[in-house]
Protein backbone atom coordinates (compact mmCIF):
# COMPACT_ATOMS: atom_id res chain seq x y z
CA UNK A 1 0.00 0.00 0.00
CA UNK A 2 1.31 3.44 -0.96
CA UNK A 3 0.32 6.04 1.60
CA UNK A 4 0.67 9.72 0.78
CA UNK A 5 1.94 11.95 3.56
CA UNK A 6 -1.17 13.19 5.41
CA UNK A 7 -1.60 16.68 6.80
CA UNK A 8 -0.96 16.14 10.50
CA UNK A 9 0.03 19.73 11.29
CA UNK A 10 -2.91 20.63 13.52
CA UNK A 11 -2.46 17.48 15.57
CA UNK A 12 1.24 18.18 15.99
CA UNK A 13 0.86 21.86 16.87
CA UNK A 14 -2.37 21.96 18.89
CA UNK A 15 -2.89 18.52 20.40
CA UNK A 16 -0.88 17.51 23.47
CA UNK A 17 2.27 15.42 23.29
CA UNK A 18 0.43 12.78 25.34
CA UNK A 19 -1.23 11.42 22.18
CA UNK A 20 -0.03 7.90 21.43
CA UNK A 21 -1.95 5.64 19.04
CA UNK A 22 -1.80 8.20 16.24
CA UNK A 23 2.00 8.08 16.34
CA UNK A 24 1.96 4.42 15.30
CA UNK A 25 -0.71 4.97 12.66
CA UNK A 26 0.31 8.23 10.93
CA UNK A 27 -2.77 8.85 8.84
CA UNK A 28 -6.09 10.65 9.24
CA UNK A 29 -9.00 8.25 9.50
CA UNK A 30 -12.32 9.31 8.03
CA UNK A 31 -14.87 6.49 8.18
CA UNK A 32 -15.26 2.90 9.31
CA UNK A 33 -17.64 -0.01 8.89
CA UNK A 34 -17.44 -3.54 10.25
CA UNK A 35 -13.78 -4.54 10.51
CA UNK A 36 -12.58 -1.92 8.01
CA UNK A 37 -11.35 1.62 8.51
CA UNK A 38 -10.64 4.16 5.76
CA UNK A 39 -8.44 7.23 5.84
CA UNK A 40 -9.23 10.53 4.17
CA UNK A 41 -7.32 9.47 1.04
CA UNK A 42 -9.43 6.34 0.68
CA UNK A 43 -6.85 3.80 1.87
CA UNK A 44 -8.40 0.76 3.52
CA UNK A 45 -7.23 -0.85 6.76
CA UNK A 46 -8.29 -4.13 8.32
CA UNK A 47 -8.87 -3.44 12.01
CA UNK A 48 -7.41 -5.95 14.49
CA UNK A 49 -7.55 -3.31 17.26
CA UNK A 50 -11.31 -2.73 17.63
CA UNK A 51 -11.01 0.41 19.72
CA UNK A 52 -8.83 -1.38 22.30
CA UNK A 53 -11.72 -3.80 22.77
CA UNK A 54 -14.51 -1.21 22.72
CA UNK A 55 -15.83 -2.31 19.32
CA UNK A 56 -16.47 -6.03 19.75
CA UNK A 57 -19.30 -5.82 17.21
CA UNK A 58 -17.41 -3.79 14.63
CA UNK A 59 -17.55 -0.18 13.50
CA UNK A 60 -20.98 1.33 12.87
CA UNK A 61 -22.77 -1.97 13.31
CA UNK A 62 -25.98 -1.59 11.27
CA UNK A 63 -28.32 -3.02 13.92
CA UNK A 64 -26.92 -0.83 16.68
CA UNK A 65 -26.74 2.25 14.47
CA UNK A 66 -30.40 1.90 13.55
CA UNK A 67 -31.44 1.67 17.20
CA UNK A 68 -29.37 4.76 18.04
CA UNK A 69 -30.68 6.83 15.12
CA UNK A 70 -34.29 5.93 15.91
CA UNK A 71 -33.78 6.97 19.54
CA UNK A 72 -32.17 10.30 18.65
CA UNK A 73 -34.76 11.08 15.98
CA UNK A 74 -37.56 10.78 18.53
CA UNK A 75 -35.69 13.16 20.85
CA UNK A 76 -34.91 10.51 23.45
CA UNK A 77 -33.14 11.69 26.60
CA UNK A 78 -29.37 11.90 26.05
CA UNK A 79 -28.05 13.14 29.39
CA UNK A 80 -29.78 11.86 32.50
CA UNK A 81 -27.28 11.58 35.38
CA UNK A 82 -28.88 8.78 37.42
CA UNK A 83 -32.47 9.78 36.69
CA UNK A 84 -34.86 6.97 35.82
CA UNK A 85 -35.39 6.89 32.05
CA UNK A 86 -37.06 4.53 29.63
CA UNK A 87 -33.68 3.77 28.02
CA UNK A 88 -32.12 2.84 31.36
CA UNK A 89 -35.12 0.73 32.36
CA UNK A 90 -35.01 -1.23 29.14
CA UNK A 91 -31.28 -1.82 29.49
CA UNK A 92 -31.55 -3.01 33.09
CA UNK A 93 -34.42 -5.36 32.26
CA UNK A 94 -32.60 -6.76 29.24
CA UNK A 95 -29.30 -7.14 31.07
CA UNK A 96 -31.00 -8.92 33.95
CA UNK A 97 -33.02 -11.27 31.71
CA UNK A 98 -30.36 -11.93 29.07
CA UNK A 99 -27.11 -11.96 31.05
CA UNK A 100 -27.59 -12.18 34.81
CA UNK A 101 -30.51 -14.57 35.34
CA UNK A 102 -29.39 -17.26 32.85
CA UNK A 103 -26.03 -17.36 34.68
CA UNK A 104 -27.65 -17.32 38.13
CA UNK A 105 -25.80 -14.10 38.98
CA UNK A 106 -27.66 -11.99 41.57
CA UNK A 107 -25.62 -8.83 41.01
CA UNK A 108 -26.82 -5.30 41.68
CA UNK A 109 -25.91 -2.90 38.86
CA UNK A 110 -24.16 0.41 39.47
CA UNK A 111 -23.43 3.07 36.84
CA UNK A 112 -20.19 4.58 38.21
CA UNK A 113 -19.26 6.89 35.33
CA UNK A 114 -18.49 6.59 31.63
CA UNK A 115 -15.14 4.77 31.64
CA UNK A 116 -13.46 1.64 32.90
CA UNK A 117 -11.35 3.43 35.48
CA UNK A 118 -14.57 4.88 36.98
CA UNK A 119 -15.76 1.30 37.48
CA UNK A 120 -12.47 0.26 39.08
CA UNK A 121 -12.39 3.27 41.42
CA UNK A 122 -15.93 2.53 42.60
CA UNK A 123 -15.09 -1.15 43.10
CA UNK A 124 -12.08 -0.29 45.27
CA UNK A 125 -14.07 2.26 47.28
CA UNK A 126 -16.89 -0.20 47.85
CA UNK A 127 -14.54 -3.01 48.93
CA UNK A 128 -12.86 -0.72 51.46
CA UNK A 129 -16.20 0.51 52.76
CA UNK A 130 -17.56 -3.03 53.17
CA UNK A 131 -14.48 -4.48 54.85
CA UNK A 132 -13.25 -1.43 56.73
CA UNK A 133 -9.71 -1.97 55.44
CA UNK A 134 -7.50 0.06 53.10
CA UNK A 135 -5.18 -2.42 51.39
CA UNK A 136 -5.92 -3.95 47.98
CA UNK A 137 -3.92 -6.78 46.42
CA UNK A 138 -3.33 -6.74 42.67
CA UNK A 139 -1.01 -8.72 40.41
CA UNK A 140 2.22 -8.29 38.49
CA UNK A 141 1.67 -6.79 35.02
CA UNK A 142 -1.89 -5.75 35.87
CA UNK A 143 -3.55 -2.76 34.24
CA UNK A 144 -6.70 -1.28 35.77
CA UNK A 145 -6.84 2.34 34.60
CA UNK A 146 -5.16 5.74 34.66
CA UNK A 147 -6.77 7.50 37.63
CA UNK A 148 -4.88 7.39 40.93
CA UNK A 149 -6.72 4.55 42.64
CA UNK A 150 -6.56 2.41 39.51
CA UNK A 151 -2.88 3.22 39.01
CA UNK A 152 -2.16 2.07 42.56
CA UNK A 153 -3.21 -1.45 41.53
CA UNK A 154 -1.53 -1.27 38.09
CA UNK A 155 1.87 -2.85 37.51
CA UNK A 156 3.29 -0.91 34.56
CA UNK A 157 6.16 1.28 35.82
CA UNK A 158 5.84 3.89 33.06
CA UNK A 159 2.14 4.45 33.69
CA UNK A 160 2.58 4.46 37.48
CA UNK A 161 5.31 7.10 37.22
CA UNK A 162 2.86 9.47 35.56
CA UNK A 163 0.96 9.84 38.83
CA UNK A 164 3.67 12.09 40.27
CA UNK A 165 2.84 11.04 43.84
CA UNK A 166 3.26 7.85 45.89
CA UNK A 167 0.69 5.22 44.95
CA UNK A 168 -0.31 3.63 48.22
CA UNK A 169 -2.59 0.95 49.68
CA UNK A 170 -1.92 -1.46 46.82
CA UNK A 171 0.28 -4.57 47.08
CA UNK A 172 1.28 -6.62 44.01
CA UNK A 173 1.44 -10.42 44.07
CA UNK A 174 2.71 -12.81 41.36
CA UNK A 175 0.22 -13.49 38.56
CA UNK A 176 -0.31 -17.02 37.27
CA UNK A 177 2.96 -18.49 35.92
CA UNK A 178 4.96 -15.39 36.89
CA UNK A 179 7.77 -17.73 38.01
CA UNK A 180 7.38 -20.05 34.99
CA UNK A 181 5.87 -22.79 37.12
CA UNK A 182 8.82 -23.03 39.53
CA UNK A 183 6.88 -21.65 42.52
CA UNK A 184 3.64 -23.16 43.81
CA UNK A 185 0.59 -20.99 43.21
CA UNK A 186 -0.16 -18.52 46.05
CA UNK A 187 2.49 -19.93 48.41
CA UNK A 188 3.99 -16.45 48.86
CA UNK A 189 0.64 -14.65 49.08
CA UNK A 190 -0.84 -17.13 51.56
CA UNK A 191 2.29 -17.11 53.73
CA UNK A 192 2.16 -13.31 53.99
CA UNK A 193 -1.51 -13.43 54.95
CA UNK A 194 -0.91 -15.97 57.69
CA UNK A 195 2.34 -14.53 59.09
CA UNK A 196 1.65 -11.77 61.63
CA UNK A 197 5.18 -10.51 61.05
CA UNK A 198 4.95 -10.21 57.25
CA UNK A 199 4.10 -6.51 57.26
CA UNK A 200 1.16 -7.05 54.90
CA UNK A 201 -1.94 -5.24 56.08
CA UNK A 202 -4.92 -7.53 55.66
CA UNK A 203 -6.45 -6.64 52.28
CA UNK A 204 -10.04 -5.59 51.77
CA UNK A 205 -10.01 -7.17 48.33
CA UNK A 206 -8.03 -8.75 45.53
CA UNK A 207 -8.43 -7.39 41.99
CA UNK A 208 -7.53 -9.53 38.99
CA UNK A 209 -7.89 -9.78 35.21
CA UNK A 210 -8.50 -13.29 33.87
CA UNK A 211 -6.40 -12.32 30.84
CA UNK A 212 -4.02 -9.41 31.23
CA UNK A 213 -4.52 -7.44 28.03
CA UNK A 214 -2.23 -4.45 28.49
CA UNK A 215 0.17 -6.58 30.53
CA UNK A 216 1.10 -8.78 27.56
CA UNK A 217 -1.82 -11.21 27.01
CA UNK A 218 -1.06 -13.27 30.10
CA UNK A 219 -3.77 -15.92 30.45
CA UNK A 220 -4.72 -17.16 33.91
CA UNK A 221 -5.61 -20.84 34.11
CA UNK A 222 -9.11 -21.72 35.28
CA UNK A 223 -7.69 -23.73 38.18
CA UNK A 224 -5.57 -20.74 39.26
CA UNK A 225 -8.64 -18.51 39.28
CA UNK A 226 -10.59 -21.07 41.29
CA UNK A 227 -7.77 -21.30 43.81
CA UNK A 228 -7.69 -17.51 44.07
CA UNK A 229 -11.44 -17.38 44.68
CA UNK A 230 -11.06 -20.03 47.39
CA UNK A 231 -8.21 -18.12 49.03
CA UNK A 232 -10.27 -14.92 49.07
CA UNK A 233 -13.19 -16.70 50.70
CA UNK A 234 -11.01 -18.34 53.36
CA UNK A 235 -9.20 -15.11 54.17
CA UNK A 236 -12.29 -12.85 54.20
CA UNK A 237 -11.20 -10.80 51.18
CA UNK A 238 -13.50 -9.68 48.38
CA UNK A 239 -12.67 -10.88 44.87
CA UNK A 240 -12.90 -8.21 42.18
CA UNK A 241 -12.66 -9.32 38.54
CA UNK A 242 -11.75 -6.54 36.12
CA UNK A 243 -13.63 -7.59 32.98
CA UNK A 244 -13.35 -4.24 31.26
CA UNK A 245 -11.45 -5.48 28.21
CA UNK A 246 -11.97 -9.25 28.47
CA UNK A 247 -15.71 -9.16 29.19
CA UNK A 248 -18.61 -8.75 26.77
CA UNK A 249 -17.64 -11.94 24.95
CA UNK A 250 -13.99 -11.23 24.18
CA UNK A 251 -12.78 -14.61 25.52
CA UNK A 252 -15.90 -16.51 24.45
CA UNK A 253 -18.47 -16.40 27.26
CA UNK A 254 -20.02 -13.03 28.09
CA UNK A 255 -17.98 -12.82 31.31
CA UNK A 256 -14.40 -14.05 31.07
CA UNK A 257 -14.58 -15.71 34.50
CA UNK A 258 -17.40 -18.08 33.49
CA UNK A 259 -14.96 -20.71 32.22
CA UNK A 260 -13.45 -20.97 35.71
CA UNK A 261 -16.84 -21.47 37.33
CA UNK A 262 -16.35 -18.71 39.89
CA UNK A 263 -18.66 -15.93 41.07
CA UNK A 264 -16.65 -12.81 41.93
CA UNK A 265 -17.94 -10.49 44.63
CA UNK A 266 -17.50 -7.46 42.37
CA UNK A 267 -17.11 -7.20 38.58
CA UNK A 268 -16.12 -4.17 36.52
CA UNK A 269 -17.42 -3.90 32.95
CA UNK A 270 -16.90 -1.21 30.31
CA UNK A 271 -15.46 -0.87 26.77
CA UNK A 272 -17.84 -3.02 24.68
CA UNK A 273 -20.82 -2.96 27.03
CA UNK A 274 -22.40 -0.20 24.92
CA UNK A 275 -21.67 -2.24 21.80
CA UNK A 276 -21.13 0.87 19.70
CA UNK A 277 -17.99 2.32 21.23
CA UNK A 278 -19.83 4.90 23.32
CA UNK A 279 -18.75 5.62 26.91
CA UNK A 280 -20.46 3.35 29.43
CA UNK A 281 -19.36 1.37 32.47
CA UNK A 282 -20.92 -0.92 35.05
CA UNK A 283 -19.88 -2.03 38.50
CA UNK A 284 -21.64 -5.26 39.47
CA UNK A 285 -21.68 -6.60 43.01
CA UNK A 286 -23.46 -9.08 45.23
CA UNK A 287 -26.58 -7.59 46.89
CA UNK A 288 -25.21 -7.81 50.42
CA UNK A 289 -22.37 -5.48 49.39
CA UNK A 290 -24.73 -2.68 48.36
CA UNK A 291 -23.93 -0.46 51.35
CA UNK A 292 -23.65 2.81 49.44
CA UNK A 293 -25.40 5.89 50.75
CA UNK A 294 -27.34 7.81 48.05
CA UNK A 295 -24.90 9.96 46.08
CA UNK A 296 -21.83 8.60 47.87
CA UNK A 297 -20.28 7.83 44.48
CA UNK A 298 -21.51 9.70 41.43
CA UNK A 299 -20.51 11.21 38.10
CA UNK A 300 -21.97 13.69 35.64
CA UNK A 301 -21.94 11.31 32.68
CA UNK A 302 -22.91 8.05 34.35
CA UNK A 303 -26.33 8.16 32.69
CA UNK A 304 -25.35 8.05 29.01
CA UNK A 305 -28.74 7.12 27.62
CA UNK A 306 -27.71 6.67 23.96
CA UNK A 307 -25.21 4.08 25.24
CA UNK A 308 -28.03 2.34 27.13
CA UNK A 309 -29.93 2.13 23.84
CA UNK A 310 -27.09 0.55 21.87
CA UNK A 311 -26.20 -1.71 24.80
CA UNK A 312 -29.76 -3.05 24.85
CA UNK A 313 -29.73 -3.58 21.09
CA UNK A 314 -26.41 -5.43 21.43
CA UNK A 315 -27.73 -7.81 24.06
CA UNK A 316 -30.86 -8.50 22.03
CA UNK A 317 -28.98 -9.04 18.78
CA UNK A 318 -25.99 -11.07 19.99
CA UNK A 319 -26.71 -12.59 23.41
CA UNK A 320 -30.43 -13.34 23.61
CA UNK A 321 -30.10 -16.72 21.86
CA UNK A 322 -27.84 -18.30 24.46
CA UNK A 323 -24.41 -19.56 23.44
CA UNK A 324 -24.30 -18.83 19.68
CA UNK A 325 -21.97 -15.83 20.04
CA UNK A 326 -19.73 -17.70 22.44
CA UNK A 327 -19.41 -20.67 20.08
CA UNK A 328 -18.62 -18.40 17.14
CA UNK A 329 -15.91 -16.56 19.08
CA UNK A 330 -14.30 -19.82 20.19
CA UNK A 331 -14.34 -21.06 16.60
CA UNK A 332 -12.73 -17.84 15.37
CA UNK A 333 -10.16 -18.20 18.15
CA UNK A 334 -9.24 -21.68 16.92
CA UNK A 335 -8.77 -20.17 13.46
CA UNK A 336 -6.38 -17.56 14.86
CA UNK A 337 -4.45 -20.21 16.79
CA UNK A 338 -3.82 -22.24 13.64
CA UNK A 339 -2.25 -19.17 12.04
CA UNK A 340 -0.24 -18.51 15.22
CA UNK A 341 1.13 -22.05 15.06
CA UNK A 342 2.18 -21.52 11.44
CA UNK A 343 3.83 -18.16 12.19
CA UNK A 344 5.70 -19.69 15.13
CA UNK A 345 6.91 -22.67 13.09
CA UNK A 346 8.12 -20.35 10.34
CA UNK A 347 10.00 -18.17 12.85
CA UNK A 348 11.18 -20.63 15.50
CA UNK A 349 14.32 -18.67 16.30
CA UNK A 350 12.43 -15.39 16.74
CA UNK A 351 9.08 -16.17 18.37
CA UNK A 352 9.21 -16.73 22.11
CA UNK A 353 5.55 -17.67 22.59
CA UNK A 354 2.00 -17.11 21.41
CA UNK A 355 -0.93 -17.14 23.82
CA UNK A 356 -4.58 -16.18 24.05
CA UNK A 357 -8.23 -17.10 24.55
CA UNK A 358 -11.24 -16.52 22.34
CA UNK A 359 -10.41 -13.49 20.19
CA UNK A 360 -7.58 -11.95 22.21
CA UNK A 361 -4.10 -13.14 21.22
CA UNK A 362 -0.51 -12.15 21.77
CA UNK A 363 2.69 -12.95 19.90
CA UNK A 364 5.90 -12.43 21.88
CA UNK A 365 9.39 -12.24 20.39
CA UNK A 366 12.80 -12.82 21.97
CA UNK A 367 13.82 -9.41 20.61
CA UNK A 368 11.67 -7.01 22.64
CA UNK A 369 11.79 -4.35 19.89
CA UNK A 370 10.48 -6.73 17.24
CA UNK A 371 6.79 -6.32 18.14
CA UNK A 372 6.94 -2.59 17.43
CA UNK A 373 8.56 -3.20 14.05
CA UNK A 374 5.94 -5.80 13.19
CA UNK A 375 3.11 -3.41 14.12
CA UNK A 376 4.68 -0.66 11.99
CA UNK A 377 5.07 -2.94 8.98
CA UNK A 378 1.53 -4.28 9.44
CA UNK A 379 0.20 -0.72 9.25
CA UNK A 380 2.10 -0.17 6.02
CA UNK A 381 0.44 -3.33 4.70
CA UNK A 382 -3.04 -2.18 5.75
CA UNK A 383 -3.48 -3.97 9.09
CA UNK A 384 -4.07 -2.19 12.41
CA UNK A 385 -2.52 -3.97 15.41
CA UNK A 386 -1.02 -2.69 18.64
CA UNK A 387 1.61 -3.88 21.08
CA UNK A 388 1.29 -4.67 24.77
CA UNK A 389 3.39 -5.78 27.71
CA UNK A 390 5.56 -3.71 30.08
CA UNK A 391 8.12 -3.14 27.32
CA UNK A 392 5.69 -3.29 24.36
CA UNK A 393 7.23 -6.65 23.53
CA UNK A 394 4.02 -8.44 22.51
CA UNK A 395 1.98 -8.04 19.33
CA UNK A 396 -1.64 -7.83 20.47
CA UNK A 397 -4.61 -8.92 18.38
CA UNK A 398 -8.15 -7.76 19.21
CA UNK A 399 -10.31 -8.26 16.11
CA UNK A 400 -14.04 -7.64 16.32
CA UNK A 401 -16.10 -10.66 17.40
CA UNK A 402 -18.17 -10.15 14.25
CA UNK A 403 -15.19 -10.46 11.91
CA UNK A 404 -15.71 -12.92 9.05
CA UNK A 405 -13.52 -16.01 8.59
CA UNK A 406 -12.17 -14.56 5.34
CA UNK A 407 -11.24 -11.27 7.02
CA UNK A 408 -9.57 -13.18 9.83
CA UNK A 409 -7.50 -15.19 7.34
CA UNK A 410 -6.60 -12.00 5.48
CA UNK A 411 -5.40 -10.27 8.63
CA UNK A 412 -3.41 -13.24 9.89
CA UNK A 413 -1.69 -13.64 6.51
CA UNK A 414 -0.79 -9.94 6.62
CA UNK A 415 0.59 -10.41 10.13
CA UNK A 416 2.67 -13.37 8.94
CA UNK A 417 4.07 -11.22 6.14
CA UNK A 418 4.88 -8.39 8.57
CA UNK A 419 6.75 -10.84 10.81
CA UNK A 420 8.63 -12.24 7.83
CA UNK A 421 9.61 -8.81 6.53
CA UNK A 422 10.93 -7.54 9.87
CA UNK A 423 13.30 -10.44 10.51
Swiss-Prot record:
Pathway: Amine and polyamine biosynthesis; ectoine biosynthesis; L-ectoine from L-aspartate 4-semialdehyde: step 1/3. CDD domains: OAT_like. GO terms for biological process: ectoine biosynthetic process. It holds the Pfam family Aminotran_3. Transmembrane segments: none annotated. The modification N6-(pyridoxal phosphate)lysine is found at residue 271. Its EC number is 2.6.1.76. The keyword Transferase applies. Its cofactor is pyridoxal 5'-phosphate. Keywords: Aminotransferase, Pyridoxal phosphate, Transferase. It is an enzyme of class 2 (transferase). PROSITE patterns: AA_TRANSFER_CLASS_3. The keyword Transferase applies. It comes from the Bacteria. One of its GO terms (molecular function) is transaminase activity. NCBIfam families: dat, ectoine_ectB, PRK09264.1. Belongs to the class-III pyridoxal-phosphate-dependent aminotransferase family. This is Diaminobutyrate--2-oxoglutarate transaminase. It comes from Streptomyces coelicolor (strain ATCC BAA-471 / A3(2) / M145). The gene is ectB.
Amino acid sequence: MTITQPDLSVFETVESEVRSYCRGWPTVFDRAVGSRMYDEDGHEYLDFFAGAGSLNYGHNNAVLKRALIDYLERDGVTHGLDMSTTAKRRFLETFQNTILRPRDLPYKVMFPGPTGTNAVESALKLARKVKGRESIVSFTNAFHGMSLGSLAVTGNAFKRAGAGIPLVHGTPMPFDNYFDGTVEDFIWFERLLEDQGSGLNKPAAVIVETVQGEGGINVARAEWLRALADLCERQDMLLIVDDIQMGCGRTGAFFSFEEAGITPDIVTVSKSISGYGMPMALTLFKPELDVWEPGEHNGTFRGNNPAFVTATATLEAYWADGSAMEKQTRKRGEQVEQHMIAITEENLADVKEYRGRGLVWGLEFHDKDRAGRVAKRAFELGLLIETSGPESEVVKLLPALTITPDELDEGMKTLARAVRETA
